[in-house]
């Protein structure tokens, strides 16, 4: 009888354990962010934007303003960073942490750094809500908070 209770207890514990998505979300999102920075640094807006979910509910929150829709976000980046004659600083990410929430949802926190030559010109923390769509993690929501200027 004691053995039966052990089997039941193990079964209950297994059912209660959170389900992890297949693969390694932390590594996959890390690869996505490195590719995203490389696209940015090459001037490839379409590549950079391919990591955002291409729909009207994709959201971007920065400095108290929420922008909705992939196209609106694309247009913002095009006008502010990728237009002819605009200077675009070199982008890197650090302190990337990813937490799976469900089989196909995760959130990530990290810091962005923008350098112009050897000078840091902007930085700050951000949070991403991501969804696995097919083989790719895509950004549903991006909340970026630039650090105050010194």
Which residues make up each language-model segment?
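Short, low-complexity N-terminal intrinsically disordered segments enriched in polar/charged residues
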Residues: 14-51, 150
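Hydrophobic pocket/interface hotspot
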Residues: 36, 48-49, 56-58, 69, ...
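A short gly/proline-enriched turn/hairpin at secondary-structure junctions
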Residues: 57-68, 82-86
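A mature extracytoplasmic/lumenal domain signature
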Residues: 52-53, 64, 97, 110-112, ...
């Amino acid at each position: 009888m004691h053995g039966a209770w052990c089997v039941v207890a193990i079964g209950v514990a297994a059912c209660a354990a959170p389900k992890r998505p297949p693969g390694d979300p932390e590594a996959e999102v890390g690869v996505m962010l490195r590719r995203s920075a490389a696209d940015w640094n090459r001037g490839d807006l379409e590549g950079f934007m391919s990591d955002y979910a291409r729909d009207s509910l994709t959201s971007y929150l920065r400095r108290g303003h929420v922008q909705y829709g992939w196209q609106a976000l694309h247009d913002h980046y095009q006008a502010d960073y990728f237009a002819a004659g605009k200077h675009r600083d070199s982008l890197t990410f650090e302190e990337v942490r990813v937490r799976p929430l469900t089989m196909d949802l995760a959130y990530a926190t990290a810091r962005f750094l923008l350098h112009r030559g050897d000078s840091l010109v902007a930085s700050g923390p951000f949070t991403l809500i991501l969804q696995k769509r097919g083989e790719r993690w895509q950004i549903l929501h991006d909340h970026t908070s630039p650090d105050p200027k010194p």
